[in-house]
Regions:
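Short loop/turn segments that connect beta-strands within beta-propeller blades
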Residues: 35-38, 79-82, 118-122, 157-160, ...
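Structural motif
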Residues: 28-33, 67-77, 111-116, 149-155, ...
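A short beta-strand motif characteristic of beta-propeller blades
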Residues: 2-8, 38-44, 83-90, 123-129, ...
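N-terminal "mature head" segments of proteins
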Residues: 1-91, 118, 122, 126-128, ...
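Repeated scaffold domains used in trafficking and secretory/extracellular systems
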Residues: 7-19, 45-58, 90-103, 129-142, ...
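Solenoidal tandem-repeat scaffolds enriched in leucines and small polar residues
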Residues: 107-210
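Short beta-strand elements that form the blades of beta-propeller/WD-repeat-like
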Residues: 18-26, 57-70, 102-109, 142-147, ...
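Blade-level signature of beta-propeller repeat domains, shared across WD40, Kelch, NHL, RCC1
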Residues: 307-338
């Protein structure tokens, strides 16, 4: 289905836009624009960049403070196409999570203040001097949702007035391993992945719509189904009803697979939907694998070993009919369809 055409090394989390790769390189922590062959097309003058974000319009990053190495308040914004400087100044913004952005607007909140910032103009739209708890997991049309285990906090997006805080532990009493990992907006509900299970809550009043008492770390939403592939298990949840389906497999366990005469456990943590298949990252004691799973039958359609990696797969993404795979050793593998 896919063949590897390029491996780029020493690269931190990347962004892919208009056929170009934007990434912080490990060598000097300098942000670079790369071609798909790894050629450097542009690089920022600033080094030791801490956090960065790139979209269609801008490149934004920050450096550590000159006074405090644990504070990152030297912020730079460049026009992505022209590479001209839009903004340079001392402002503490939370850039490490893509979930804090909604288009060109950044919703940056800390235990000190809240800053709603236009990254296209380099302009503060609103600053609110009040602390907020936790980490931002979701920005919707109306709300900003943060988590601080075992609570979620739902704020009005425009002014960060608190709508509701809710203890997710109430739905899983006695479960010590509960941890809020992901939150999704689905119709008029929130889907909360809480490690020990999944809950679906009304956005209006927080009431329980349904609950799934099965281990979950991640979910891939396709239509009205949520697909969970965690450790060795694989199952599907109907997001309207909460109906659980494990493909008639005991303990929802995926079958072992054989590759080049060796048997492997299909242990991984996430599936990604693309062109009718679920693409699953698999960890083994030697090399990682990618398995394409039919979401209707749960059967394997394609198995590929990444022999040039000895680490875990971090992410699988698809852009312009190419597959991009990163591992935990800062490598990016680019695949093209055969």
């Amino acid at each position: 289905m896919y063949k590897q055409v390029k491996k780029i090394e020493e690269l931190y989390d990347y962004f892919y836009i208009d056929g170009k790769i934007y990434a912080k390189m490990e060598e000097n922590c300098r942000l670079k624009e790369l071609s798909l062959t790894g050629e450097v097309l542009w690089e920022a003058e600033e080094t030791e960049i801490r956090y960065n974000y790139v979209n269609n319009n801008v490149i934004i990053f920050n450096l550590e403070s000159l006074e405090d190495k644990y504070t990152y308040d030297r912020t730079f914004i460049y026009d992505r196409r022209k590479k001209t400087l839009i903004f340079k100044g001392e402002i503490k913004l939370i850039l490490f999570s893509k979930k804090c952005f909604d288009g060109n607007i950044l919703y940056s909140s800390t235990n000190e203040n809240i800053i709603i910032f236009d990254i296209l103009k380099g302009e503060i739209l609103k600053k609110i001097d009040k602390p907020t708890m936790g980490i931002t997991l979701l920005v919707t049309e109306k709300y900003v949702i943060k988590k601080y285990d075992p609570y979620i906090y739902i704020y009005v997006k425009s002014d960060y007035s608190l709508v509701r805080q809710q203890n997710i532990q109430d739905f899983f009493p006695g479960e010590e391993d509960l941890s809020i990992l992901e939150i999704y907006s689905y119709k008029d509900t929130f889907i909360i992945i809480a490690r020990v299970g999944i809950v679906c809550l009304s956005q209006k009043d927080g009431s329980l719509i349904w609950k799934c008492d099965h281990y979950a770390r991640t979910m891939e939403i396709v239509g009205h189904y949520g697909y969970v592939c965690t450790s060795l298990s694989f199952y599907r949840v109907d997001l309207d009803t909460g109906e659980f389906y494990n493909y008639n497999r005991k303990y929802s366990r995926l079958p072992d697979f054989e590759y080049n005469g060796e048997n492997h456990w299909p242990s991984g943590h996430r599936v990604v939907y693309h062109k009718g298949l679920l693409w699953y990252d698999v960890h083994t004691s030697k090399h990682p694998f990618i398995i394409a799973i039919d979401p209707e039958t749960g059967n394997y359609q394609w198995i590929h070993e990444i022999t040039s990696s000895n680490r875990y797969i971090e992410n699988i993404k698809f852009y312009d009919n190419r597959m991009f795979v990163t591992d935990t050793d800062y490598n990016l593998f680019i695949y093209e369809e055969e």
